[in-house]
Structures are given as C-alpha cells and as structure tokens.
C-alpha cells in the first residue's frame, strides 16, 4: 500500500534489462508467459485496491489542470481592474491564453522528463512551476508579472496530462485500467468546478482573485509530497535495467502472486525488440515502424479539438445569457453535464470498451451540433430556438465527456509501445495544444465571417469524420495488459 517504506535504489545493481539473467530462463519466457496468463485467468485478477492510492495521487495533477483552466474565468474582471488593463480585450485574452503557450512548451519536454527522471519525479517537476506560477500570479501588481505567472503555470499544465496518462496506464491492472483512466477526466472536471465555486466571492471581496491563485499551491504541494510515497512505474524501471525494483513495484501494485507473469511479459517484449535503438527520435515517431500508431494518436487529439469542444465551452455563457440564464448558473450546468458524462464513462469504460464509447461519443456530438444548426433556423419560434441551442450545448458537453474527452488520453498510452510511449505522448499532446490554440484564436473571427450555421456544420462534419476514423483505425484494448496489446500490434504487418 501507499505507506509502505520504499526500498532504496542503491540496494539494486543497475543492469541492462537485456543483459539481466533472471532465475527463469529468458529463452523460455514466451512459454512461461502463456502458461502464467492461463493460470492467472483461472484464478483471480489482481486486487484493484493496491494500485488505487497511487492513481488517486497522480490525478491531483489533472485536478490542477482543470483548476488552472478555469481559475481566471470569474475573477478576470477584477484582475483587469486591479492591474490597470480593464477594457483591454487583448490583455484579457493574453491572461486567459498565455497558459496555452506554456502548456505547449511543457508538453514538448514531457516525454524527455518522464523517460529521463521517471514518472514519479516527473510529477514533482510538474508541480514546481505550478506552485511558483500560482504564487507569482497571486502577488502580481502588473500585467507583465501576471503573464509570467500564468506562463509558468502553463508549463506545469503541459507536463502534467501526458505524465498522468502514462503513469495511470502503467500502474493500473488491466481489468480496471479504463476505470482508473476515467479518473483523470473526472479530476479535471472537479478542478474546473472548484475554480468556479472558489471564484464566486470575487465580486464581493476585494483582492479575492489573489486567494484563488494561492489556494492552488496546496494540491500542487500535496502532489509533490505524495509522489514520495507512490510506486514508480515498473515498465520504466525495467527499461532502466532496475529489474529487482521493477519486481518490487509490481508486488506493491498487483500483489506477489502476479509478479512472475508481469515480469515474463516484459521479458517477452524485450526479446522482440533487441534490434531497436535506445534513443527515440522524432523521425522514428513520424516514419519508423510505429509511425502508424503515432498517426492514430495525433489524429485523435486533432479531431477531439476540431470537434468544437473549446468553442462550445467558450460560447456557452453567451448561449445561456440569451436564454435568460445567468452566466454563473450556466457554467454550473455545463460543469455538471461534464462531470455526469465523465462518471458514466468511468462506469462503462471497462464494460463496453474504448472504441464503442468513442464512436457513440462522436455520433452524439455530431447530433448536438446539428441541434445548434437547427437553432439558427429563421423558421423556428424564438423560444424553440433557445431550447435547441441550450439543449445542444448540454448534450454536446455530456457526449464529449462520455468518450471523446477521456478516451484518447487513456487509449494512446495503451497502444504506444513502452519504448516510445513517453515521447509519443509528448508529440501527440503538442498537436493537441497547437490545434487548441488555433481553434481558440480563430473561433470568434470565423463565427463573425461564416455565421453560426456554417461554423457549427463544420464542427458536426469533423465529428462525423472522427466516427469514420475511429471505426477504421482504432483497436479495442479493454481487458488486455499493456504487454498483450504491444505484442498484438507487433504481430500485425
């Protein structure tokens, strides 16, 4: 469990996993794998309780991600007034969006940090700029200092999601990996809602926006400290040649009876990859033997953003205001829809599978965008159009949270081979942030030039394209170990 005393790495000799000679003959590892898998299937799955505390600590990074996405929404007017740029829409936009620049930079380095320092240390490195940036934002007395603080926070936001996806995927037993992966999305929703509720007093208490930033240092510090007690990824330890430590961490996460099977799977994969270099280059990701899965991952993230989710979040306040609903109440409705969809996804992820959730999620989002298109019709009464618009917004957020939101972050670490997993996630997340930036930058301009009907039709078309892409390219990973998924992908021509 979480509180067990960690054995120091100095007790173990650091050797290459390929040179290490275990007690069992490595040449027999393939047969051992098959026998052990059969035996284990005849008994029971590993206990989910062993890995749960480690997953919960890791999802603090996702809570922080959601919190910092929403922390300036309510206080922005007070911030601009206190710092002297009230009415300057460009400056206000920079305060909101400068995080994206930091997040893009952080995502570029996330793979190197996760592979170089390990998953646990990567979380701690992620927490540092979040603590420093939140403190700087809270004490800022000018726009420049505020932007510096927000940029620092953004770098932590860019580091956190890829590392969280990697860690949760690598420490979770196969039969609950989908459920645990959904915790990431739920934590993000809770962070967004926490930022909303904490920001409510900002209109009545002078300088409350500073408290909103400072409060975020508490979960960031808990993340950094909690990781001292958490298990390191056994896959990462194995790659580093720390065989005994990998076995010890498997025992903490799965239980002693499942260690031999898990290690045999790693040895089988290691034998299959003896001709591959240790260093993963960008050219290998784009043109190497695993380029197809990298293409699938980056395209999924691109389609996720091109579906219009951030535009819907951005425009939801206007939609609710036009229907006579206060913006803060409208934000609560959106937050509840997001959380409800995420909870349903958590329940269904390991029952119906990732692919089916993705398909129905994008289908539902396309239908919701069709409702938005219908709401722009001049033939509808005003009240009916408002109902369609509000209903379309809530249905879109709900169906997004069912699959298109949580599944890519879970699915990609599952289908990426262990050797390239961190670097491939970093590449795909950088694609995510670039598309995110341009959608946010161009949405209002396109809305003005094209009108809502054509723009929402484009978003609906992207959702339908995503349905076809998922149906053709995405494999089902439900209930399979990471090693089984990798072996099946390697077996494909």
From Swiss-Prot:
- List localization entries: Plastid, Chloroplast membrane
Q: How does it sit in the membrane?
A: Multi-pass membrane protein
Disulfide pairs?
A: none
Single annotated GO MF: transmembrane transporter activity
* Location (main, coarse): plastid
Which keywords does this chain's UniProt record carry?
Chloroplast, Membrane, Plastid, Sugar transport, Transmembrane, Transmembrane helix, Transport
Look up the domain of life of the source: Eukaryota
What is the name of the protein in this document? Probable plastidic glucose transporter 2
> Whose protein is this, by species?
Arabidopsis thaliana
């Amino acid at each position: 469990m979480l509180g067990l005393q960690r054995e120091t790495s100095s007790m173990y000799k650091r050797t290459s996993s390929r040179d290490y000679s275990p007690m069992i003959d490595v040449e027999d590892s393939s047969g051992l794998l098959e026998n052990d898998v059969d035996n284990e299937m005849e008994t029971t799955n590993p206990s989910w309780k062993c890995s749960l505390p480690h997953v919960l600590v890791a999802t603090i990074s996702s809570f922080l991600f959601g919190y910092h996405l929403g922390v300036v929404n309510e206080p922005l007017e007070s911030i601009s007034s206190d710092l002297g740029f009230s009415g300057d829409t460009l400056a206000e936009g920079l305060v909101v969006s400068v995080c994206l620049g930091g997040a893009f930079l952080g995502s570029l380095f996330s793979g190197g940090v996760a592979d170089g320092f390990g998953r646990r240390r990567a979380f701690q490195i992620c927490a540092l700029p979040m603590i420093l940036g939140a403190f700087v934002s809270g004490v800022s007395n000018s726009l420049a200092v505020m932007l510096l603080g927000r940029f620092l926070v953004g770098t932590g936001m860019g580091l956190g999601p890829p590392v969280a996806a990697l860690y949760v995927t690598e420490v979770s037993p196969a039969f609950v990996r989908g459920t645990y992966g959904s915790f990431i999305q739920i934590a993000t929703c809770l962070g967004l809602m926490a930022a909303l509720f904490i920001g409510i007093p900002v209109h009545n208490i002078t300088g409350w926006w500073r408290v909103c930033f400072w409060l975020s240092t508490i979960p960031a510090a808990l993340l950094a400290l909690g990781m001292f007690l958490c298990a390191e990824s056994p896959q990462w330890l194995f790659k580093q040649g720390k065989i005994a430590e990998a076995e010890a961490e498997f025992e903490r996460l799965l239980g002693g009876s499942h260690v031999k099977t898990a290690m045999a799977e790693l040895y089988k994969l290691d034998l299959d990859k003896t001709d591959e270099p240790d260093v993963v280059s960008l050219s290998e990701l784009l043109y190497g033997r695993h380029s197809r899965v990298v293409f699938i991952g980056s395209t999924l993230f691109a389609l996720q953003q091109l579906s219009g989710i951030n535009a819907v979040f951005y425009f939801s306040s206007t939609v609710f205001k036009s229907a006579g609903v206060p913006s803060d109440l409208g934000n609560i409705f959106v937050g509840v829809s997001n959380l409800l969809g995420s909870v349903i996804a958590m329940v269904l992820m390991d029952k119906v599978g990732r692919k089916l959730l993705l398909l129905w999620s994008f289908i539902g989002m396309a239908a919701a965008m069709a409702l938005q298109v219908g709401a722009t019709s001049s033939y509808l009464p005003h009240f009916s159009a408002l109902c369609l618009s509000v209903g379309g917004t809530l249905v879109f957020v709900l169906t997004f949270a069912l699959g298109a939101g949580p599944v890519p972050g879970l699915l990609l670490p599952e289908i990426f081979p262990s050797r390239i997993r961190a670097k491939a996630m970093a590449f795909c997340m950088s694609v995510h942030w670039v598309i995110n930036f341009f959608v946010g930058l161009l949405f209002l301009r396109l809305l003005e030039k094209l009108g809502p009907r054509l723009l929402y039709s484009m978003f609906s078309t992207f959702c339908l394209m995503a349905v076809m892409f998922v149906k053709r390219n995405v494999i089902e990973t439900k209930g399979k170990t990471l090693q089984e998924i990798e072996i099946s992908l390697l077996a494909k021509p």
